[in-house]
């Protein structure tokens, strides 16, 4: 498992935990930072996990708006918590992290959904993220 895949899993754990426990992402991140300080072997995954969670915190309104726009017939509240977390990471990587190719972001999210969620979740995640990737503004393009 690559360092980035481990980081995505770590970020997913943080997003899911904060959602289910109904605590702020900032608090969950602070607790994890304290834990990470004592685990130098996991530093590489921690750095990208933190970048993901910080990115979701900074852009959550737009991320959630994108999810709600393309999740035909589904509200965020109706989705399983693990799917919300997977989608938030995927949308952040698609829209706010130019270092991750769209196909990689989608593939990683689908794999997480396959392993961690319901039988239907992988297809749902794939379809939703593919629509967002297809409709996102490209370099030099004005927001729609």
Swiss-Prot record:
SUPFAM superfamilies to which the protein is assigned, alphabetical: NusB-like (SSF48013)
GO terms under biological process: DNA-templated transcription termination; transcription antitermination
Transmembrane segments annotated in the record for this chain: none
Claim: Transcription regulation is one of the keywords in the record? yes
The GO terms this record gives for MF are: RNA binding
Q: Span of the secretion signal? A: none
Q: Name one Pfam family in it.
A: NusB
The answer to whether the entry has keyword Transcription regulation is yes
Q: Which UniProt keywords apply?
A: RNA-binding, Transcription, Transcription antitermination, Transcription regulation
The record's annotation in InterPro entries points to: NusB-like_sf, NusB_fam, NusB_RsmB_TIM44
GO CC terms:
cytosol
Question: What's this chain's function?
Answer: Involved in transcription antitermination. Required for transcription of ribosomal RNA (rRNA) genes. Binds specifically to the boxA antiterminator sequence of the ribosomal RNA (rrn) operons.
The text of the family note is: Belongs to the NusB family.
Name of the protein in question: Transcription antitermination protein NusB
Traced from the root, the source organism's taxonomic lineage reads: Bacteria, Bacillati, Actinomycetota, Actinomycetes, Micrococcales
């Amino acid at each position: 498992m690559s360092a980035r895949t481990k980081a995505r899993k770590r970020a997913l754990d943080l997003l899911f935990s904060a959602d289910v426990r109904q605590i702020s992402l900032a608090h969950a991140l602070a607790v994890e930072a304290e834990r990470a300080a004592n685990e130098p072997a996991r530093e590489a995954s921690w750095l990208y996990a933190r970048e993901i969670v910080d990115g979701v915190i900074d852009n959550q309104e737009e991320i959630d708006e994108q999810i709600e726009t393309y999740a035909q017939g589904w509200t965020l509240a109706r989705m399983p918590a693990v799917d919300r977390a997977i989608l938030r990471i995927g949308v952040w990587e698609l829209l706010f992290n130019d270092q991750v190719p769209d196909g990689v972001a989608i593939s990683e999210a689908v794999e997480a959904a396959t392993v961690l969620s319901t039988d239907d979740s992988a297809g749902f995640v794939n379809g939703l993220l593919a629509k967002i990737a297809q409709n996102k503004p490209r370099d030099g393009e004005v927001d729609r």
